[in-house]
């Protein structure tokens, strides 16, 4: 059994999630009283984006050990994957009640609260996280989103820029800052920022997409099409979203040939 556990961890590290999951499911059947097996299984299901199976595994862990904060966190994460913000918040609140300094749970709850525009409650989580770690990047980005939502664009920009300075490889910071520039009609700044992001990571699909959007708004249709095509090449799942981006580009044949 111990060897199976080591092997499942090795599969996870190698990215062989299907093999890891198969092994963990066998382990769960052999020793159905071990919380750790179900927690690992839930994490593997998360990697596979199988949120219903993740929820089942987390629930089984809770049935074994009701007071396990990580199990409640994973259950909240599973509901988040199914776009159920209310139940996400409920499960994460339970996790935080069990473990008050649970940074990951507070950050995930803050994201769900952002979706519901519950900014006051969201800031309570963000402040609690930043009190533990003043340079927690996700907390700073979420604080920026609150400021942006409240019409404080300059203050939001400061938060986003600060994160890019702390960690130049934080891609979410570039996306938030670039999207803010686009909303503010600072299209040249947005394009320049995404140039920088793509230089740091030439496979940054979202940066190509957002740069394409900025170029389109700036009147550069050809450049926009090239960026959108590159984004789609890097992330084929985005095809439906890209179709929407080009709805104002005239005949489909002039927009992105081959994907419509």
Give the role of each language-model region.
Residues 14-26, 48-60, 81-94, 116-128, ...:
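Structural signature of tandem alpha-helical TPR/SEL1-like repeats
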Residues 217, 222-260:
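Terminal, low-structured helical/coil segments at or just beyond the last alpha-helical repeat
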């Amino acid at each position: 059994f111990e060897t199976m556990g080591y092997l499942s961890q090795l599969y996870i590290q190698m990215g062989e999630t299907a093999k890891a999951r198969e092994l963990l499911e066998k382990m769960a059947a052999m020793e159905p009283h071990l919380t750790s097996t179900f927690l690992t299984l839930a994490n593997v299901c998360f990697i596979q984006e199988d949120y219903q199976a993740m929820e089942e595994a987390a629930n089984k862990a809770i049935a074994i050990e009701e007071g396990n904060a990580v199990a409640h966190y994973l259950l909240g994460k599973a509901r988040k994957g199914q776009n159920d913000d209310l139940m996400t918040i409920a499960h994460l609140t339970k996790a935080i009640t069990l473990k008050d300094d649970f940074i990951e749970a507070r950050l995930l709850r803050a994201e769900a609260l952002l979706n519901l525009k519950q900014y006051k409650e969201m800031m309570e989580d963000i402040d609690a996280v930043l009190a533990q770690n003043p340079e927690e990047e996700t907390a700073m980005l979420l604080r920026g989103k609150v400021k942006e939502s409240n019409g404080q664009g300059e203050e939001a920009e400061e938060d986003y820029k600060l994160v890019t300075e702390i960690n130049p490889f934080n891609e979410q910071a570039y996306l938030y800052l670039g999207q803010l520039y686009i909303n503010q009609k600072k299209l040249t700044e947005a394009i320049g920022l995404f140039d920088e992001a793509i230089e740091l990571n030439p496979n940054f699909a979202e940066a190509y997409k957002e740069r394409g959007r900025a170029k389109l708004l700036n009147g550069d249709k050809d450049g926009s099409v090239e960026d959108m095509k590159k984004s789609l090449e890097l992330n084929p799942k985005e095809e439906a979203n890209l179709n929407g981006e080009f709805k104002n580009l005239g005949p489909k044949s002039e927009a992105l040939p081959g994907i419509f």
